[in-house]
Amino acid sequence: MNSTQRFEHKVVIVTGAAQGIGRGVALRIAQEGGCLILADRSDLIQAVLAEIKALGALAIAVETDLETYAGAELVVSHAIAEYGRIDVLINNVGGAIWMKPFQEFSEEEIIQEVHRSLFPALWCCRAVLPEMLKHQQGTIVNVSSIATRGIHRIPYSASKGGVNALTASLAFEHAQHGIRVNAVATGGTKAPPRKIPRNAQPLSKSEQVWMQQVVDQTIDRSFLGRYGSIDEQVNAITFLASDESSYITGSVLPVGGGDQG
């Protein structure tokens, strides 16, 4: 186990925990003594659960669709049944499905982007809040994006702008109840290929060009001229989730090599 036990005896929900940043966050919290509820709609979450149990940490996994309020309620009910309370919620579900100019998006595609990248955070905050209010304490970290100012992802950008507004307003509304709410605006992040792609369709030549333009813009706007690593994002997320950030709330922390979004 990690010598730093920032999450000892803490009950932590991590959504979107089956791969990428979510998996990295879950493993770090397990190494630091946390009791975990892993949530994802993919059965890949079971492999992450096995990894965490191999570390000797306490964890359960809930396969559910967090684009629905019922899915968020299911996660909370499992957490309460298993541990009796919730100390930390980390909302990590989201990600751009398509990359193309706004006029190329259909109505249905726009709806899918918003459902994917805004509603899971809204639903999970709403579902967990009564439990945190009951105990007059809690910490929420929303994973946002520096793409709130960027090209070819406007529905996703608007969704993450909504996550930032949710973060600020919820922090303002519930600070008096001992609940802190912050966000990490992740920049471009190097990660293994997704086991379940957000968009499984082959890219057209135009879509390949548009995607490369997004990559180029991301690197150009980073002062450090590179993508970040999963560990670098995990460092920021777990800092805001821990008591080390006890005097920080209502903040959006950009982690994009200097790109402020």
From Swiss-Prot:
Its EC number is 1.3.1.25. GO terms for biological process: benzoate catabolic process via hydroxylation; fatty acid elongation. One of its GO terms (molecular function) is 1,6-dihydroxycyclohexa-2,4-diene-1-carboxylate dehydrogenase activity. NAD(+) binds at residues 13-37. Substrate binds at S145. It catalyses: (1R,6S)-1,6-dihydroxycyclohexa-2,4-diene-1-carboxylate + NAD(+) = catechol + CO2 + NADH. This is 1,6-dihydroxycyclohexa-2,4-diene-1-carboxylate dehydrogenase. It comes from Acinetobacter baylyi (strain ATCC 33305 / BD413 / ADP1).
